Amino acid sequence: MALGGGTFLVQNKVLPGAYINFISVAQASATLSDRGIVTIPLAMNWGPEGKIFTVEQADFIKNSQKIFGYAYTADELKPMREIFLHAKTVHFFRLGTSGVKAANTYATAKYPGTRGNDLRTVITANENTTEQKPLFDVETFLGTVQVDLQEGVAAITDLKANAYVDWKSSGTLSLTASLPLTDGTNGTVADSDYQTYLDQAEAYTFNAMGCTESKATITALFAAFAKRMRDDVGKKFQVVLFRKLADYEGVVSVKNGLTSDKTSTALIPWVTGVIGGTAVNKSATNMTYDGEYDVDTDFTQTQLENGIKEGSFMFHRVDEAVCVLTDINSFISITDEKSSDFSSNQTIRVLDQIANDIAVLFGKKYLGKVPNDAAGRISLWNDIVKHHTELQDIRAIENFSGENVTVEKGDTKKSVVVTDYVTPVNAMEQLYMTVYVQ
């Protein structure tokens, strides 16, 4: 008879033998999450309506025409180019939901919008066509660019949908020099579109949100959304708005317009990319504006000082360059509980990084999985200390040691209480120097 063997849960076996458990050593998963994820709603001439769609920076560069309907260099994509200068991933939302798809005898545009009117169908005879069996080559053009070719097609039902059109299910193919799609329209942007966007955005993770609408009711809506998400839900991000002095660390208020239009909100995408894409150990102070717009920097020294005092994110001119004046948010009401440090976006980046990373760590590794005993709390302490040590290694915080973190049992058997002291590092901004001449 064979000896006993296998694995064990408790030491209650009867037969002699070797009972061996193989368990992976727990790995600390308290790593720093990456930044550079942002979201923004925009009016567009092409693309899916009424829902968020995600675009990576590399996809935008290579496939902008398929995604947005235009070549990468087109003027219509300037807001997208601006935001991708410093963002890696963007959750876009196309505003307007009542657009009409352009169409012709053979095809219907993939999406509603005026860009569909630039599509056209060209049908020529295939080289193998005969009277008994006509064959056609069917081309789809966007402007002057061929975007699809299907050769040797006998019937319209043989055509396969492409990135630009869906073919109609009935009809007869015939030689066509150029048949445009017509009657495509953009949907009218309504205030309710912004609420639809915000409702959908709750399910996504991002570092910054932007809004190019300057209407007071809309900016107030976005500011309230950011405050609710940050303070009530625990989802930490900053929202970039135009001249919205919300007196809140979660709202960045951009003051500058353009030289051609001082009230233009065109800089919002660039700032959104910067706020979301700047590393946790970096500051955007004195960052050079590398976008395509002519920024209005017609401010006096006093106006710049007042802008900082009121909580405005501003640009100013340094020789031939346009630079960020200082990397601040709209918070100005300093209290004993909230010092002036909370007006620094670099400080908020550090605090948001800690909040988001530890929440993810707890949810994935501890929630409902690790017992709330001394060993479990020590494990959580170890992971938090490891996370903060990484922040200190990249000079995002300073003067940190394990003694700054305590993990204790809460008021109930299921709760755990963490007390955490951190000192965020900020970049140098002012130099006070006294030179003694002998």
Segments the model singles out, each with a brief description of its role:
Residues Y72:
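Soluble or luminal CAZymes and related metallo-dependent hydrolases
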Residues A2-G47, I52-F60, K66-I67, D75-P371, ...:
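A glycine- and small-residue-enriched flexible loop/hinge signal that marks low-structured segments
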Residues T406-Q438:
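C-terminal edge-of-domain segments
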